[in-house]
């Protein structure tokens, strides 16, 4: 423990210092204790010329008037600018400058495009006139009545020199009358016959009356309706083969001119549906006999007369004897008509063919060696019509099966099963 010294009483304790005292006051007190001279700043007079250290308050006070001065100056400047803007400004005239190179190139390009458009338009219009001149100059007169050799060589007749054959004939139509009149009948040419058919042209040939007119035309014609065949009476099939070879060796004779039937439609009339009927044929082992009507109702077309295949051999053949038809009260009939009348009406029969010519139909049945056939007469549009039927069958299926037993030529005509009630109604 330190000893107490008398000097210690004179020394102040630093712990006894007041908290508010500054370091200068402490230093001053120490200096006074030591006896050092002190300067009293209050007694010193400072000149205004000396720079004083400004305080913060003084700085703020000095800055405020400076800011006010700057604001006043800026306001004055804005007012001056507004005054200057309000004054009308004089427009300065643009100095005339030479055209730039770019503008010159654009103008040249536009001129070139215009020239191209004009040139293309003139080129398109020019060929039309030149082509018309070429076509006019390239036209050649063709003389149809001239010689073929001259036309082949390119020789053209001199203009202005025309013969009587080349002169053009004026065609004048007759004047039209105000009142309806009958049309002029065209001039009939040689080898043709005019036939007037009633009804529409599409269904005119299906009418029995029109078929009869066509049959009459075919009968009156001088042309054969079937190819000529040669069949001697003796030697059977061997002589038939020899006749074919002879006809092949001999040249064909000239044929007479055909007769054409001109069909003109008239006013339509009520048509009656006809049943399909096979075409009648003439016997093969005969000379060319009378022409046969070859019309077929379901086809509604008239078959043209076929050409002669060869000349007939000069051999006389016996024509088949015509069978006498058993006359009945209704008209011409052949066969057992009573069996058809007495059979039940629910049964069926086979219709083989029909025609307006009784003799041809009966002769064809004889030629095909048909058995139990019946030819009976009926009327159709007021005209006689003959139907060829064969057999009596209990059902339609049985009648269809019986078709296979018929000759091949008969089967080719497509026979069909017909109810007996229709046959019995026709016989009454």
Swiss-Prot record:
Compositional bias ranges of the Basic and acidic residues kind: 7-36, 50-64
Acidic residues bias: start-end ranges: 65-82
Chain intervals for the UniProt region annotation (Disordered): 1-99, 149-191, 225-344
Domain SPOR as annotated: residue spans: 342-419
Entry keywords, A to Z: Cell cycle, Cell division, Cell inner membrane, Cell membrane, Coiled coil, Membrane, Transmembrane, Transmembrane helix
Biased composition (Basic residues): 86-95
Coiled coil: 55-87
GO MF term set: peptidoglycan binding
Polar residues composition-biased segments: 236-248
GO biological process: cytokinetic process
Cellular localisation: Cell inner membrane
InterPro entries with a match to the protein in the record: DamX, SPOR-like_dom, SPOR-like_sf, Vulval_dev_neg_regulator
Major localization listed first in the record, in broad terms: membrane
GO cellular component, one term: plasma membrane
Role of this protein: Non-essential cell division protein.
The family this protein is said to belong to: Belongs to the DamX family.
Written domain comment of the UniProt record: The SPOR domain binds septal peptidoglycans and is required to target DamX to the septal ring.
Protein name per Swiss-Prot or TrEMBL: Cell division protein DamX
Source species of the chain: Escherichia coli O157:H7
Lineage: Bacteria, Pseudomonadati, Pseudomonadota, Gammaproteobacteria, Enterobacterales
